[in-house]
Regions:
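The catalytic-center signature of Zn2+-dependent metalloproteases
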Residues: 140-206
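Cleaved targeting-peptide boundary
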Residues: 25-29
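Generic structural signal for residues positioned in beta-strands
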Residues: 35, 102-104, 133-134, 177, ...
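A structure-centric signal for secondary-structure junctions around beta-strands
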Residues: 30-33, 99, 129, 193
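Fold-level signature of zinc-dependent metallopeptidase catalytic domains
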Residues: 31-43
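N-terminal export signals
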Residues: 5-24
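Metzincin-family zinc-dependent endopeptidase catalytic domain
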Residues: 41-157, 169
Length: 206
């Protein structure tokens, strides 16, 4: 794998927002076109929710790719899960016109190296300013009080990771969905589930 900067999402963004998605607008048109790439079986209704959330919050266009089998090269036998950075390596060649970014989505557990731990389970991983990111719904379900909250975590994690590919870093505003969860569910439970004004401005969103 070539040298790239990855940003890790160590916990989900889990609070149901009191307000509906506010549709993002840019005078120049969509900031990116995201290829939504299922890795293994993935419910179509989940894809619908993810697409709607990405379009609404980030103002991106979305194209859907057919499902792909998870690559054997990403499998980590000692923990029986998939390495997120290797999944991104697999996904990156899927960025072909009109797509400018790719988001892989899977229901299986994923991991990366973090906090001095070789194999640390994560919700998602994104290339900062790069082409690819991947999320898993596996941890979205952990300690979730409802299916609705599980789905909200899934969608906001997707927005978070695509945000990293668009150049956003972790945000100091703890209410912003780009905040660094640091692995603490109670931290993400306090987020609004939306981008703050500063992060929206960085993307040129109204």
């Amino acid at each position: 794998m070539d040298r790239r900067t990855f940003v890790r999402s160590l916990a989900g963004l889990s609070v149901l927002s009191a307000a509906p998605w506010a549709f993002a607008q840019r005078p120049e048109g969509p900031i990116a076109t995201v290829a939504l790439a299922p890795l293994g079986p993935f419910p179509p209704s989940f894809l619908d929710e993810i697409e709607a959330g990405l379009r609404a919050e980030l103002g991106v266009a979305v194209v859907r790719l057919p499902p792909s089998a998870l690559p054997r090269a990403a499998w980590y036998p000692p923990r029986r899960r998939y390495r997120a950075e290797r999944l991104i390596d697999f996904l990156r060649p899927m960025v072909r016109p009109p797509a400018t970014r790719v988001l892989g989505v899977t229901q299986l557990d994923i991991s990366t190296t973090a906090h001095g731990v070789h194999d640390w389970g994560v919700l998602g991983l994104g290339e900062h300013g790069g082409l690819g990111c991947v999320i898993s719904t596996f941890r979205c379900r952990m300690n979730s009080p409802s299916e609705a909250q599980t789905h909200f975590r899934m969608v906001t994690t997707c927005i978070h990771e695509i945000g990293h590919t668009l150049g956003l870093e972790h945000c100091p505003d703890t209410a912003c969905l780009m905040t660094d969860a640091r692995g603490l569910v109670r931290t993400v439970d306090r987020t609004s589930g939306h981008l703050c004004a500063r992060c929206r401005a960085r993307l040129g969103l109204r």
